[in-house]
């Protein structure tokens, strides 16, 4: 699927009437699994990127180049649209422009730019936000850098849990007026907060890890929520599986005694072994 088609598929979700849950993806294998299972799109979170690329916690240590390369690998591996958490855009508004250019070229279907002050400021234990003016400048720079008009740009704010609901709405309205395609809110905890956000804005809404009170997807859809990110369990599950397998091997378990391993059939499927074999036969004269 061409980049434009993937971006069009994501736009169709935003303009639709349902609230969907994306797959948390972080590498070529995970995005292929998500694609095979029929997820509508993948979400490449910033915390997951830090884990998959560096093995570090989510403290803004990865570089734009590292992020874009991982997106490029995933975009090559599967046709599933990917929304990339581009964090703060890796610097000021001019850095945001470069971020959009690189992620668009890497095949991202969409990306989010947030207003969190990153990296963490000296002496500040709690998350901080950039000013409304700086946040808006970043959004405008992101929109100006977009070459393919189908690339989805989502303005994200963490104000609900850092400053106030009113601040979150004011920031979102500024991003909406600037021309973003959707609004992403983190820290929304109650139906009342969502009602206020939905009433004040007109764009499609995305929520980050909504709590149980916001677990009814029909209710979310009626409030214009089109994306509900359900955390990033897959990489945690993969980490646990590797830990258990290596622990068993260290303790002397024989290969055939190991449990919880992917079958040969599943490995062939996620590595597209049949496609590779067909190409080998066609281009190398290697009989299957």
From Swiss-Prot:
Residues that, per the record, bind substrate: 47, 156, 232
Required cofactor names: Mg(2+)
Protein name in UniProt: Oxaloacetate decarboxylase
Entry's Gene Ontology molecular function annotations: magnesium ion binding; methylisocitrate lyase activity; oxaloacetate decarboxylase activity
PANTHER family assigned to the protein according to its UniProt record, in alphabetical order: OXALOACETATE DECARBOXYLASE, PHOSPHOENOLPYRUVATE CARBOXYLASE
One protein family per Pfam: PEP_mutase
Note on how the cofactor is bound: Binds 1 Mg(2+) ion per subunit.
Organism in which the protein naturally occurs: Rhodopseudomonas palustris (strain ATCC BAA-98 / CGA009)
Role description: Catalyzes the decarboxylation of oxaloacetate into pyruvate. Seems to play a role in maintaining cellular concentrations of bicarbonate and pyruvate.
Organism classification: Bacteria, Pseudomonadati, Pseudomonadota, Alphaproteobacteria, Hyphomicrobiales
EC number: 4.1.1.112
Binding site for Mg(2+): 85
The family this protein is said to belong to: Belongs to the isocitrate lyase/PEP mutase superfamily. Oxaloacetate decarboxylase family.
GO biological process terms held by the UniProt record: oxaloacetate metabolic process; propionate catabolic process, 2-methylcitrate cycle; pyruvate biosynthetic process
Record has Lyase as a keyword: yes
HAMAP family: OadC
Keywords: Decarboxylase, Lyase, Magnesium, Metal-binding
């Amino acid at each position: 699927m061409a980049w434009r088609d993937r971006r069009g598929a994501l736009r169709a979700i935003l303009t639709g009437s349902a609230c969907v849950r994306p797959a948390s993806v972080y590498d070529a294998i995970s995005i292929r699994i998500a694609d095979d299972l029929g997820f509508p799109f993948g979400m490449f979170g910033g915390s997951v990127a830090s884990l998959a690329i560096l093995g570090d916690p989510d403290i803004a240590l990865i570089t734009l180049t590292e992020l874009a390369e991982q997106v490029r690998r995933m975009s090559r591996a599967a046709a599933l649209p990917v929304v990339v958490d581009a964090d703060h855009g890796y610097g000021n508004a001019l850095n945001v422009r470069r971020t959009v250019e690189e992620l668009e070229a890497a095949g991202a279907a969409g990306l989010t730019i947030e207003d969190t002050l990153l990296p963490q400021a000296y002496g500040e234990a709690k998350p901080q936000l950039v000013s409304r003016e700086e946040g808006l400048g970043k959004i405008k720079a992101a929109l100006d850098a977009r070459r393919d008009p189908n690339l989805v740009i989502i303005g994200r704010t963490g104000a609900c849990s850092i400053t106030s609901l009113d601040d979150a709405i004011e920031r979102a309205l500024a991003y909406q007026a600037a021309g973003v395609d959707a609004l992403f809110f983190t820290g929304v905890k109650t139906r009342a907060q969502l009602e206020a956000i939905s009433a004040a804005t007109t764009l499609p809404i995305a929520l980050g890890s909504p709590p149980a009170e916001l677990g009814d997807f029909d209710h979310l859809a009626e409030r214009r929520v089109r994306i509900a990110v359900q955390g990033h369990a897959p990489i945690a599950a993969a980490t646990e599986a590797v830990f258990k397998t290596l622990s068993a091997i260290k303790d002397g378990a024989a290969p055939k005694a190991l449990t919880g391993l992917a079958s040969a059939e599943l490995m062939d499927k996620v590595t597209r072994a049949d496609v590779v074999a067909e190409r080998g036969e066609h281009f190398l004269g290697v009989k299957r």
